[in-house]
Amino acid sequence: MLFKSPRVLLTLFGLLTTPAARAQGSPEWQQRVAYEMDVTLLADSHRMKGRQRLLYENNSPDTLRNVYYHLYFNAFNPNSMMAERNRHLPDPDGRIVPRIFNLSPDEIGYHEITSLTQDGAPLAFEIHDTVMEVDLASPIPPGGTVVFEMAFHSQIPLQTRRSGRDNREGIDFSMAQWYPKMANYDERGWHADPYIGREFYAPFGSFDVRITLPSSYLIGATGELQNPSEIGHGYGETEIPETDSLTWHFRAENVHDFAWAADPDYLHEVVEGENDVTYHLLYQENVAEKWEKMREWVPQIIEFYSRRFGPYPYPQFTVVQAGDGGMEYPMMTLILGDIPPMGLLGVTAHEAGHMWYYGVLGSNEADYAWMDE
């Protein structure tokens, strides 16, 4: 059958590939999460401390007696499963090897969970590399809602793959998969896959995130900044406050992840586009000439996809110089910035396409990479 509208294709594709559609005889359901996080970045020591409140809705027909969290930073050390996998591969990932084997104790990544409760009751948990298994104080019945509260400390790894500090272009912090993250549960059960440098799958929900760090830093992130008048840095008309630190407050709805990047040397361009979408470009001054046309290209890319796959469903899109190549996250992408202009155009167009596939689609990238790549 010939479909004239790409929007119809996207709709049908989503219906045919959602977990609910594959679960014969079961009604459609998805788990839902609502994160509230308050974190402080200790820039000089490359560490972070934070608190997380997670409202978890069990919309499945199953009673849950355990939950699982991903602790992605634990992958970045010479003894992790990701390191071991690459140690024995005939064709190891050149972005990981040999760097991961040379990480010193102050360069590795880790998460330490200092407390975890369910509706106020302390919980026991075990950590296996990048996965934390939690025994619940009481089961979560179908339709049940619980609140998990957590305190954690983390060391931000030297950038090896996607996330970390001090990437090869001198960006201080590329913060992807940076928080203890609830694994997804669907009709196939828990997807608590160990992290070996591959892809992601998570439940949709909301994020309310406060990040405190030195006032010289400029942040690009998922979501909308809630306090631009307190921040400046191009988000508001105010000058950068003369304080030691600033707390940035972001909110995002109907997303399955939250990422951010921070550097004291970012330039920040803001472009207002069609359909009330705001575009943010963050890059360092030494690549400004290469980024000159990005203020034209980025809105054109999103508008192109919007005409073909359905309107871009979020209020903003951020392109930020960070990471180790190109990687998509809700409402933003991290890309290397010191490449030729046509390279910037190509990688941005590719990553922007992920705002629909897998961003809106929400497919399991780990199992079904063909759906979005």
Feature names for model-found ranges:
Residues 46-59:
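Short beta-strand elements of extracellular/lumenal beta-sandwich folds
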Residues 182-189, 196-352, 373:
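Hydrophobic helix-coil surface modules that form long, contiguous segments used
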Residues 355-368:
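Catalytic Zn2+-binding segment of zinc metalloproteases
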Residues 69-121, 212, 216-217:
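Solvent-exposed beta-hairpin/edge-strand motifs
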Residues 52-54, 69-71, 144-158, 207-215, ...:
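Short, hydrophobic/aromatic-enriched beta-strand segments in well-ordered soluble domains
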Residues 22-49, 169, 176:
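N-terminal, polar/Ser/Thr-rich
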Residues 81-93, 153-207:
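Glycine/proline-rich low-complexity spacer/linker segments in large multi-domain proteins
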